[in-house]
């Protein structure tokens, strides 16, 4: 069993066979037509360094025009802040998100790296490991 823990707002899986954990908005927000906004989920994930977490669109929302802008968003094991979801409204109207709405899915996957690793720790913030 892989040790994955959550702090803050704990995401849930819909069924025992669901690959993704549902991430929820922590605030009411309006996303204007054509705009992209960052929404804090209040969720902090702690997981082993051989995994990364992918923030993926919810299929039902994507079908209606709301999707994760950088899908999949990649979260490294050394990211130490709450998860933010960058949502893009592809519709011609404003999109209302209410606190508690499911806005994305979080899926954990193993990965392989090769060669030299240049740094031991992260120096950048959201979306950055530096330069």
Which residues does each predicted region cover?
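DUTPase catalytic domain/fold
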Residues: 1-131
């Amino acid at each position: 069993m892989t040790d994955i823990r959550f702090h803050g707002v704990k995401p849930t899986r819909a069924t025992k066979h669901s690959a993704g954990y549902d991430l929820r908005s922590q605030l009411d927000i309006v996303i204007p037509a054509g705009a992209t906004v960052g929404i804090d989920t209040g969720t902090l994930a702690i997981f082993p360094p051989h995994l990364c977490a992918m923030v993926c669109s919810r299929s039902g929302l994507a079908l209606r025009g709301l999707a994760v802008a950088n899908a999949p968003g990649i979260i490294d094991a050394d990211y130490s802040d709450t998860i933010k979801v960058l949502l893009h409204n592809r519709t011609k109207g404003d999109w209302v998100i209410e606190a508690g709405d499911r806005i994305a899915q979080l899926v954990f996957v193993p990965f392989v790296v090769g060669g030299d690793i240049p740094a031991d720790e992260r120096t950048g913030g959201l979306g950055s490991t530096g330069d």
